[in-house]
Amino acid sequence: MSLFSRLSTWYFSKKSLPYWGIILLDCCLILFSGLLVYTLNNGVLSTLDILGHLLVTLLVCLIPYLVGFRLFHTYSGIIRYSSFVDLQKVGFAVLFGLICVVVFQVLTDFSPYLVYIRKRDLILSALLAMSLMWMMRVFVKYFYVSTFRVAKAERAFIYGVKQGGVSLAKSIQNQDPARFVLAGFISDMAEIGNRYLMGVKVYPNNEDLIGVMRRLQADVLLVSPLKVEAIRNNQEMVDRLIKANIKIYMTPAAQEWDGKSDLSHTQLREVNIEDLLPRDKIEIDLEAVREQLTGKRILITGAAGSIGSEIVRQVAQFAPERMVLIDQAETPLHDVRLMMARGWPDIESYTVVSDICVRERMEELFEEHRPDYVFHAAAYKHVPMMEDNPEESVRNNVDGTRVIADLSVKYGTRKFVMVSTDKAVNPTIVMGCSKRICEIYVQSLDQAIKDGKVRGRTQFVTTRFGNVLGSNGSVIPLFKEQIKRGGPVTVTHKDIIRFFMLIPEACKLVLEAGTMGNGGEIFVFDMGKPVRIVDLAERMIRLSGVKGIEIRFTGLRDGEKLYEEVLNEEETSKPTFHPKIKIAQVRAYDYADANLRIDALVHACAVEGDMQIVKRMKEIVPEFKSQHSKYEVLDE
């Protein structure tokens, strides 16, 4: 290693050069400039004759420059991070020193020990010194950036050329150590021409994009906040990037960025598969929901689950008077309790570990808190588990719903909102059928109240939607775990498709549908475009960067469909107040008959076997046809 390399490595390994070191360098440059200008104007021999006196003169002239350095703090910055502001400070300090020297020369007679320097030479030496100080700072910064700061940085393109992309570019240029080096911008404008932005070229977003990135050795794409929605809805572009092993990083979406503040490079994160699935932006009438929930008493069952905990989060933002949060899972409910204490300490909240099927305990809670709104998210949801344990599906899902619904009526709850599932439509599984029975019960109870057959004021609303991204036990966390273990990734069938929705988006629609409904409705959510599960698995494997992960097809599970529905053959839908929400028009059931059938079903769970229990479920829901299941014999 050369001496220069050793010195530069030593210097840049330090946090900064001591301030006296910067002052010493600047003083040397001023002395050198004065000596050089005088020599060029008066000759080498003449300069050598008076060299001692000349050096004394230059040292005296240095004093006002030192005062200027002090006044303008030219030594307070770190040279490797010099900016235009730092160069300005140097310019002002040199100008101050020059003016002081000229004024001193005009007002006083120079001592015989000092050499008279013409004003022109003083000005030229000051300009030269200032230029050298600027050059020194620019060189150190450039050398540091090009050699040390970006040594381990990845070359990156930025998708987006407006304020979001520019702010992102500025952010990554100020990183230390650098994570990324800007190699180019990508624009959706058809005709880009030969345009440059912040010193790099702007390229069109077309089929040549991957080739351009490879040619420039860029293997990272940074997505501007204003382009988050665009890349989600451009699946062709996403597929090309993933297949080329281009890593994608995202910043907060446009709605989370005010468009003015600087973006921090710490906000950049590598995308998850959830970030890249196509979805429409969902807006709800926040003021209408706020008007319904603010200052009210809210009870939420299943409050520690994926959906329930998000409902807790979103309801808390509307400042209810009291929240009663029920779940039988102790540890995750404790996490919800801590979240409430940390995020909404002013809300009176109660976390209750209990089974919703225990009517006596639930009645104590209703009598004490008398909730205005009930959000019922508690349910067993795992398909294979419920196929093996139909009595628990009935006990928890069906009877638990009936307990909470009956108590809501008894204690004057204004509105009961039940979270259902698209698996309740033409059910082929026990879990889906149990949720359909829940729908039948709350709908028939709502109609009985309207008809005056049951005394009460409660309005019952059902919300029905499909899979949510990232919920506990869902396919995406499962695939992540399988990839982490090295595979294989298991998919039940190559043609299986599913609808997906983000948990926060689903819960927004639950809140709006629940608060806006008039009772008796089954609200069906528009889940967007379906996703092939095998395509999802392939994308996740590519995003992980792990090679050689096998996808293994295991066959459809008991009761599993190739695709899910939100309406059955006999149901139609009509539009509502929200374009993403429709009302399913389903056939009505008699409350007394439904209640008797459910009584018999719940009793059967205590005295009969699985086959008899499922047979009774099929009698209540005739469209329940088992598939790939031991219960298929009951349909013959």
Name each region found by the language model.
Residues 213, 217-219, 320-321, 366-375, ...:
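Proline-aspartate-enriched helix->loop->beta-strand connector
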Residues 245, 288-292, 444, 448-636:
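Strand-loop microenvironment adjacent to phosphate/nucleotide-handling motifs in alpha/beta enzyme folds
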Residues 35, 40, 44-46, 140-257, ...:
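A solvent-exposed beta-alpha-beta segment
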Residues 4, 234-297:
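Flexible, Lys/Arg-rich cytosolic regulatory linkers and terminal tails that connect or flank
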Residues 244, 258-260, 376, 382-383, ...:
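Conserved Rossmann-fold NAD(P)-dependent oxidoreductase catalytic core, especially the SDR/UDP-sugar
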Residues 298-316:
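N-terminal Rossmann NAD(P)H-binding glycine-rich loop of SDR-like oxidoreductase domains
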Residues 353-373:
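Conserved Rossmann-fold cofactor-binding substructure of NAD(P)-dependent oxidoreductases
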Residues 1-152, 180, 196, 219, ...:
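Signature of alpha-helical transmembrane segments in polytopic membrane proteins
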